[in-house]
Design a protein with these regions (language model features):
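N-terminal amphipathic alpha-helix/helix-capping segment at the start of soluble metabolic enzymes
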Residues: 1-7, 64, 251
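Glycine-rich, proline-tolerant flexible connector loops at the mouths of alpha/beta enzymes
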Residues: 6-18, 38-59, 223-233
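Active-site-adjacent loop and "lid" segments of alpha/beta metabolic enzymes
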Residues: 51-60, 98-103, 159-166, 186-213, ...
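Active-site glycine- and acidic-residue-rich loops that bind
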Residues: 11-24, 123-134, 153-171, 189-208
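Conserved anion-binding
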Residues: 45-49, 103-171, 175
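N-terminal active-site wall of soluble small-molecule enzyme domains
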Residues: 41-100, 105-109
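Alpha-helix-loop-beta-strand connector modules within alpha/beta enzyme cores
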Residues: 24-33, 52-78, 113-119, 169-180, ...
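Hydrophobic faces of well-ordered beta-strands that scaffold small-molecule active sites
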Residues: 6-9, 37-41, 77-79, 97-99, ...
Length: 251
């Protein structure tokens, strides 16, 4: 049976110093437990609730900062692309291109990501079922992508809330070999904190353990040394100090 893998890092690139702190801990966890870890961070958060919210350093500077992490720590990289023109440049740096949930039906974006030859991780939209994800997968494969992952991150449940139907994990296994559980975005309260997203990080461990039972291969955690001071998604991010104990439970 394949060992679980971890995707983790801060929501957005805030500074080189933050990337160093998080990457060093992820490298330590990866080596200590012999678990594959992908370092994740976004160079641009293009879908923030408010126009005044921090978005990140942008494509060119952000990719250079991610490349520095890979050189220094040897961790494979994952980042998200929001527009088709970003895919080629990002694909030259990272190992996995991620398609945001809200954009998972955007054909041109999926095709552009597929054309890079890199693995594509498609996050399931908050308004789709696991069964619906056959079609984004088909778009990537028709465009030549050799490896596609799918990620569960919950579904819209009324206003400012999400609920996870864990049946989506085995459903998505019909279309791909690797299904990931996004344990931190699944506990979001979208737009529920007055112009920004809230969240309930105390439920992150339960999300991870339930997803393990349902057959998830990978586990996605946004993590930060001090989530209360994070510039994006703080309320749902896992404290970096708590990541090791949770990873141990998943192995």
């Amino acid at each position: 049976m394949e060992k679980p893998f971890i995707i983790a890092g801060p929501c957005v690139i805030e500074s080189a110093e933050l990337l160093d702190v998080v990457a060093a801990e992820l490298k330590r966890i990866s080596e200590q437990f012999d678990v594959p870890v992908w370092f994740k961070a976004s160079f641009d958060k293009a879908n923030r609730t408010s126009i005044h919210s921090f978005r990140g350093p942008g494509l060119e500077r952000g990719l250079q900062m991610l490349a520095d992490v890979k050189t220094k720590y040897g961790l494979p990289l994952l980042t998200d692309v929001h527009e088709s023109f970003q895919a080629e440049a990002a694909g030259e740096v990272v190992d996995v291109l991620q398609i945001p949930a809200f954009l998972c039906r955007q054909t041109d974006l999926l095709v552009a990501a597929a054309h890079t030859g890199k693995t594509v991780n498609i996050k399931k939209a908050q308004f789709l079922s696991g069964d619906d994800m056959r079609y984004p997968v088909e778009k990537c494969r028709e465009a030549g992508c050799r490896e596609v992952w799918l990620t569960e991150r919950g579904n819209i449940y009324g206003y400012n809330n999400l609920v996870v139907d864990f049946r989506n994990i085995p459903l998505m296994h019909r279309w791909v070999d690797r299904v990931v559980m996004d344990c931190t975005h699944a506990v979001q309260r979208p737009g529920g904190a007055g112009g920004k997203t809230g969240g309930d990080r105390e439920f992150v461990p339960q999300m991870a353990l339930a997803a393990k039972v349902f057959g998830a291969n990978g586990f996605f955690f946004e993590t930060h040394p001090d989530p209360e001071k994070a510039l994006s998604d703080g309320p749902n991010m896992l404290y970096l100090k708590d990541l090791e104990s949770l990873v141990k439970k998943l192995l």
